[in-house]
């Protein structure tokens, strides 16, 4: 049996530059990882089936699950005959803007690479993974990075300074395609990509907090004002910086001290069904 840890990602920045001819948006975003993890195990079967075993009933176990899709893609690409069972211990909130599905798919590709002794380079897996999810290449590598294109052009950056992260997901679901459809690229909105990159290079925590920005936040916030209320609540209760991750609805806050993070946690815990205190990984 093979084990893999699948950490959640957060966006330090997210900018959308223009709509591409292939229907996707050209993005420029800085992402890092946090120690909120799913845990996956992989075991060979005697038949050819892919079986996904996940305890939570709201998580699909068929080909709607990105881990299942990743396993299908790996089997087809590398002509793998023997089936496998994928067991997922799910801790990352779903449909949250934290790449919970993508990180499971990435862990599946890494896990199968070891389980079947394929020894393929991770960069090769990234090129495969982009076929089923734009966050998957980042999740396969799992390091702080500037991602461009659809998300497949990856430039490694320095790890962020050490900090606590309070992650809060309100009780609502958001469809990423719906958010991108409602995005008006003619509306002015500043995303501080370069400032964030410089903050990572210099290890400047205060500048990092000031640079947190997301082009999709006003769009998701207009549809669901809970998002902006949570962000305001975090900042009012001592967050050094706060921003929505991905297309939402999750908002996170950065804090230098654990006591500070606990205070923010207590402030938002009553209005969110899922709140976690974790650490930046990067």
From Swiss-Prot:
Keywords: ATP-binding, Kinase, Nucleotide-binding, Transferase
Active site as annotated: 9, 135
Reaction equation(s) it catalyzes: 4-CDP-2-C-methyl-D-erythritol + ATP = 4-CDP-2-C-methyl-D-erythritol 2-phosphate + ADP + H(+)
Enzyme Commission number, as recorded: 2.7.1.148
Binding of ATP, residues: 93-103
Family the UniProt entry places it in: Belongs to the GHMP kinase family. IspE subfamily.
Descriptive protein name: Putative 4-diphosphocytidyl-2-C-methyl-D-erythritol kinase
Organism placement in taxonomy: Bacteria, Bacillati, Bacillota, Bacilli, Bacillales
């Amino acid at each position: 049996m093979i084990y893999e840890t699948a950490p959640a990602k957060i966006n330090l920045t997210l900018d959308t530059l223009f709509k591409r001819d292939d229907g996707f948006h050209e993005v420029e975003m800085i992402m890092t990882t946090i120690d909120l993890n799913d845990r996956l195990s992989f075991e060979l079967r005697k038949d050819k089936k892919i079986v996904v075993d996940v305890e939570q009933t709201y998580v699909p176990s068929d080909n709607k699950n990105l881990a299942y899709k990743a396993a299908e893609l790996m089997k087809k690409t590398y002509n793998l005959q023997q089936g496998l069972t994928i067991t997922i211990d799910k801790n990352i909130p779903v449909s949250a803007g934290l790449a919970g599905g993508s990180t499971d798919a990435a862990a599946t590709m890494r896990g199968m690479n070891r389980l079947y002794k394929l020894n393929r380079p991770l960069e090769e897996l990234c090129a495969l993974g982009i076929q089923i999810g734009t966050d998957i290449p980042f999740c396969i590598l799992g390091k702080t990075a500037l991602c461009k294109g659809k998300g497949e052009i990856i430039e490694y950056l320095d790890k962020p300074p050490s900090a606590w992260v309070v992650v809060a997901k309100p009780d609502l679901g958001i469809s990423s395609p719906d958010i991108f459809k409602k995005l008006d690229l003619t509306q002015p909105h500043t995303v501080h990509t370069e400032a964030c990159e410089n903050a990572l290079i210099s290890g400047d925590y205060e500048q990092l907090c000031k640079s947190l920005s997301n082009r999709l936040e006003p769009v998701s916030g207009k549809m669901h004002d809970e998002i902006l209320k949570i962000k305001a609540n975090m900042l009012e209760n001592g967050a050094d910086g706060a921003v929505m991750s991905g297309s939402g609805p999750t908002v996170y806050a950065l804090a230098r001290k654990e006591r500070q993070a606990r205070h923010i946690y207590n402030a938002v815990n009553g209005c969110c069904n899922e709140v976690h205190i974790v650490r930046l990984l990067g």
